[in-house]
Amino acid sequence: MDDAVCTVGLYDASREHSACGVGFLTRKDSRQTHDVLLKGHEALCAVPHRGGMSSEGIGDGAGVSVDLSLSLFRRLTGAALEPGSFGVGNFFLPSDASQHDRASQLVAETLEEAGLRVLLMRDLPVDADDDLGPRAIKAQLPIRQWIFAAPEGLRDAALDSRIHGALLAIEAVAYTDAALDGLYPLSLSARMQVFKGRLNSWEIIPYFKDLSDPDHAVHTMYFHTRFSTNTDPHPSMAQPFRLMAHNGELNTDKKNRLSEAAIALARNKAIVRPRGQSDSCRLDQTLNARVFEEGLDLVTAVVAMMPPAWENDTRLSPRVRAMLEYFSLSEEKNDGPAALIFGDGTIIGARLDRLGLRPLRTVETADYLAVMSETGQIAFPPESVTRRGRVEAGGMIYWNHAEGRAYETEDALEQLAAKEDYAALLGAAQVNIDDLPSADSDLKLAAARYFGDLERPARYVAYTHNQESFKFLMDPMLQSGAEKVSAMGYGNAINALSDNEGGVAKYFSQRFAQVTNPPLDSIREADGMTLRVALGEKPHLGHSRSRQIVVNSPVLRMADMLKIKAQTETPWDRFDILYEPVFGDALANEAALISAIDAVANEVVGFAREKGGIA
């Protein structure tokens, strides 16, 4: 289903940016109590300013994710449930009420086919009183809940995988059948469940009666209150999602989507996305795939998808650097700004992306560990607080309930790096272009070497250089030896309104959410950003047929081009992108251009499938 967002005139919803509120609270002894929900409500009530609200008082969205309460679900089902022996699915029902029964049948049959025996189906009770307001009540979607038993002997990761398969089967129908528009799984898990809606932060706990039920005892809760960013406010795009909640924007989202689609195509699979999917929802969908389809543990997946700025950080140990560099060969970075809360019932944690432009404050007592957007969201008695702090750029903190201990950035990275011999994996997967043998004995000659048939003035024209290019850009740079810096706006005409297309270089631009973020000075930019690029087939799941070549910049020197042509580490090929225009007949010329583009695309795809490498 189309996931494009609305654009009207000059308005583009994908460029909306605001700040959300996120956080988690967990009992360090793993004991389930209702007090966690009461304290969570206190935290949510403290940040109404971090959630958007319409003029009619309707919230952009708020929600919570909690571990499955034994006391509540034992009472509801009348069964002697044990941790890991049952699961819960919460679903928004279709917008068309006449399709509710069909949607319920789809969910129930899919669960049964997966061997997940349904114990109880019910509509989640809500407190739709006058405090919420009639328009806000109308904006909510009904949630139907399924409680199911796990097959005998199927537990832990095997059960998670079975449930995830059922979830994908439901999504494949729900997101592609127009009649079921609106059917959306908030969560389907044997570990956690999600409650959310078009609510304000202070409304979420009172609205869902289960969350106010004294029998609803949990050990972990994480929450989100939303300023609608790159989608219109809608209950399904409220957060948390299934494994995470996210404050910020993902400026790499388009690149991430293209990369994931290409990988899925190479595996003869397809990614089915909900309509109007936000960047945060896409991140959660990818995180679920890494954990439940590729077998990564949650912390490894989070670090691989949102790595620290390791390239210029000399404080990292060699094995941590090797691990992060190995991850970078196959995983596209999800760069924010982004503050991420992640949890699966056993692990609950928080992470900042490499830029660190969103706040995450930590507080710890003898009983609780909490990480939230702001300090003081929960009024812990001062004498009970053992330490306070913050998560720094590229940093993280998480609590492992299986081990009963916290991990912070350094310990977490060292523990992950010790799981594999990443130095050996890295050596087998990549080679730096600087380590390749030189293909030309004279580097100065190589830099000036040209194999085309154009004279120098014609090459200037081909590269769209004119008198202004030399007068205002290149001549000052040649004289000073420094990059030309100016503060004027970019006033060049777009290609459609210009006879001078501008060449490939004109398409290089940086997408950055500068509306809500402070400027980065050159020192911090060097710490947090890199131009490093890996060329060649990604080593996904160990199936790569060749080593990648790592280059320090996407702009290659002629000496680099000669090295790539001479090397035998990875296949390469060149493709003719010229076509013969049809003058005097616009339609025929259009058809010829489309045919030429399709032919080049098919050649490149054929090369990638047969050999893989650099095209």
Language-model region placement:
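A short small-residue
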Residues: 21-24, 273, 576-583, 614
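Conserved short alpha-helical segments that host acidic/polar catalytic motifs at enzyme active sites
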Residues: 1-547, 557, 565-566
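C-terminal accessory domains/tails appended to large, multi-domain proteins
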Residues: 553-556, 593
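Hydrophobic beta-strand segments of well-ordered beta-sheets in folded domains
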Residues: 86-90, 573, 614
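Alpha/beta enzyme core
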Residues: 597-614
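Short, aliphatic-rich beta-strand segments
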Residues: 517, 573-575
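Active-site mouth loops of central-metabolism enzymes
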Residues: 575-601
